[in-house]
Amino acid sequence: WRRDCAFHHSISHTGPITVGVLSEGAIGIDVEFENRRIGVSPSLLLRRMFSTEQDAAACLERWSLLQLWTIKEAVLKASGYGLAGGLTNVALNRQRGSAECFGQVYGLTLLRWHQYLITIAAKQNV
């Protein structure tokens, strides 16, 4: 153990699984069961996740609602704000597979393990 070692970490869990990631730079991870029941209407959740209906519709062409949730939560964790940073503050670049939050760009890695959706967001040095 070294106090001058600047590692960043993030963990997430759902049901029986826990995932974690360690990096030398800012990083976030989120996991969700792909068939998870959502306790609110999808339209309400989309309004809380996106500034405009057009942004929501464009992102739903590429990703499922739960994938979008894992992306936004992983980015907010990597930013250091967590969900308090606000889901609408995460802008997705569908062509590049990246996201922007509070002026920082985050690379995205989307994984599927069994029936779980996992997203890792890593801050990019631009």
Language-model segments: residues:
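Core catalytic alpha/beta fold that binds nucleotide/phospho-ligands
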Residues: 1-126
